[in-house]
Amino acid sequence: MLDTIRSWVNETNLHFATSRRPCTEFKELFAGYFPESFLARSYYVEVPEVPLPPLEYVSQAGLDDLFGQSVAGLTLDDTYYLTPSAANNLRIHFHELVHVAQWQQLGYRNFISRYLEEISIYGYDQMPLERMAYDLDARFVAGGPVVDVRQTVRKLLEDNDTDVSLRSHEEIE
């Protein structure tokens, strides 16, 4: 199934390749959080509807509940997809860039495997990969101390802690 998902991710990113915009347009806003070199290799696409995997993949992976709801954004490797209303929300861009960093740190197979496992165990709202992204985007919005997101993601993933909440990882600051 991972190979099937990988094919869909690659095909989707290829289909939208000419519409991708580099995230370097956020370099001033996200200075200190993401290096410009990372932003230059991260992309987003504004789409009327976020591309979703074929229904048979969704059902097979047990993600009916996740993709049954309205999806404002979805990260596929180095590219994330946003609806027009989400594209104007800086916090959502930040959140999706955390997922790009997670993809890079874990690699394709480990990211997908972990995401599927976490969502089946914890559900979307409590799964560690999403909590990590939500905690980091909340810190950004609150104007808290700037942290290097890639290093923070790396540290949290290396800890391999099921509770990746930044509140329990104050040593990262």
Describe these PLM feature segments.
Residues N10-L14, T18-A40, Y44-P48, G62-V71, ...:
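Metalloprotease/metallohydrolase-associated module, dominated by Zn2+-dependent proteases
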